[in-house]
Amino acid sequence: MTKESNDRDTVAREKRRARLLRGLDLKQSVGVEIGALCWPLVRRADAGKIIYVDHTDTPHLREKYREDPHVDANEIVEVNAVWGMNTLHEAIGGQYVDYVVASHVVEHVPDLVTWLRELAAVLKPTGEVRLAVPDRRFTFDYFRRESGLPEVLTSYVERARVPRPFCLFDHCLNAADISTAQAWRGRIDRASAKRHHTWQGALHLARDVVENGTYHDVHCWVFTPRSFANLIANLCDMDLIDFACEDFADTVRNGIEFSVVLRRSCDRQYIAESWRRMERAANDVTVGAPFSRARRKLKEMTVGSDEAAPVARVTGRKYDLDPIEPIALPPDFDPVDYLAANPDVLDAGVDPVLHYMHFGWHEGRPIHPPPAILTTERADVTGPK
């Protein structure tokens, strides 16, 4: 690689990073980045506190990617929290964070609903999730169909921990080597595209999942911006999640991804309209069709002039639209400790669980007293033996 091309890549990475993190006050925030590997969006030097989360620890990740030409194993970040069979909240020690960032991760998770709910469970009342998502139309998923509600719900009720057979079949039978530039010009020939797997290999992997529970890493879910908005809107309508779409950046020309900012809300109408707004904004003009470039530009101009769109919440600010309660109590919540840490709640005779759910979470109250006074305070709360 020449110095000039390397410089261009560096500039492109920094522009992408700035776009995905726009509005976040990294220095004053606590955040989580999932699956950073050697390309963290949030760097330790830039953040007040960043928690790197992955499915295993750093030594195992470096060993896993040692021979992968696309990953610099020596530059993989030091993982702070391992999210495996535990919940994300357990993995990060029961903390609440200002933001969660995940780049090209959401498409890999076997149970999309539970994954999103676990992200929601670690957010502060004003917290956000920033996702970068591959656009099927310009990647090796080109020939795959967009993921639908039935498959997502099936994985949810099954509590899937590994990619399900239908995901493996769709990937193995349809994933192919695709030129992004040609995809943007609409010049992909199905017959000549080189496939990643054979149907025999697909059957083998599916049987391995059913019989042995083996994890095979594939894109479980396939999206375009419009299909993503429609799917998440349906999940919100079913009260499975309560995320609104606060911001959306469509796939840029010759790019392969779109990005979405999600934030919890107590207003169901606001949530529903936010996803309808993203659906309307998403440019679904078929690439390669006659006058597609002109139609795409016209769509962009039409969306840009939509004066009826409500103003999204500003990152970090409190609004009446914000959620009323946390998804659940922190994993290490102890009523006695909470009363010891908050003597005014004890004096008021208020139920500690109800107080935390309705007030303590919003107020950022501690759930444990300082260690130096823990024993004494617990004795005061529980009374004589």
Task: Please give the residue ranges for each predicted region.
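Charge-rich, low-complexity intrinsically disordered regions
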Residues: 303-385
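Conserved SAM-binding loop
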Residues: 29-144, 260-264
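Residues that flank catalytic or metal-binding motifs in active/ligand-binding sites
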Residues: 46, 255-258, 352
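S-adenosyl-L-methionine-dependent methyltransferase catalytic module, highlighting the catalytic core
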Residues: 71-76, 80-83, 114, 124, ...
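Class I SAM-dependent methyltransferase Rossmann-like catalytic core
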Residues: 1-28
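Short alpha-helical segments and helix-capping/turn motifs at coil-helix boundaries
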Residues: 14-21, 34-38, 114-115, 246
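Short, cationic low-complexity segments
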Residues: 274-306
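Aromatic-acidic/polar surface patches that form glycan- and anion
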Residues: 24, 104-108, 217-224, 251, ...
